[in-house]
């Protein structure tokens, strides 16, 4: 049996992080967590691209453009969508989630969903490092693992195909 999986070695990986300015109290902490995770695991500053955008909906356009560039090993999208009194929360949360899923099905570059969807600001802050760990850090770990998995899948599938299996 062959088991293929990624690891947490970030050396040489190029990672983009897309982060909105909206809800900056939360998203800045998510970004800090993501950058901490990437750097702790060997991703160098020169291989990290941070793209600041106005809000979470703008991530869809930005992700498409980053995918078109085809220079990153993985892309992290961060954000904080906090429920309010209108339907806007549902629209934003659903559309960004659907877009990330669609891009992951149709592109070769893994996109990691690090967008918080919470009922309250307190819940968002807790998930951005106050109590429940930092989801930005967790997204960085997933990005490194998936970037390495992508490389291994390419290598192992290519080697298998080359050997006639």
UniProtKB/Swiss-Prot annotation:
Record's keyword annotation contains Oxidoreductase: no
NCBIfam families noted in UniProt: lumazine-synth (TIGR00114)
Stated name of the protein: 6,7-dimethyl-8-ribityllumazine synthase
PANTHER family: 6,7-DIMETHYL-8-RIBITYLLUMAZINE SYNTHASE (PTHR21058:SF0), 6,7-DIMETHYL-8-RIBITYLLUMAZINE SYNTHASE DMRL SYNTHASE LUMAZINE SYNTHASE (PTHR21058)
Species this chain originates from: Thermotoga petrophila (strain ATCC BAA-488 / DSM 13995 / JCM 10881 / RKU-1)
EC number: 2.5.1.78
Similarity comment text for this entry: Belongs to the DMRL synthase family.
Alphabetized CDD domains for the sequence: Lumazine_synthase-I (cd09209)
Upper taxonomic lineage: Bacteria, Thermotogati, Thermotogota, Thermotogae, Thermotogales
InterPro entries attached to this UniProt entry: LS (IPR034964), LS/RS (IPR002180), LS/RS_sf (IPR036467)
Residues at which (2S)-2-hydroxy-3-oxobutyl phosphate binds: 85-86, 127
GO BP: riboflavin biosynthetic process
Active-site residues annotated for this sequence: 88 (proton donor)
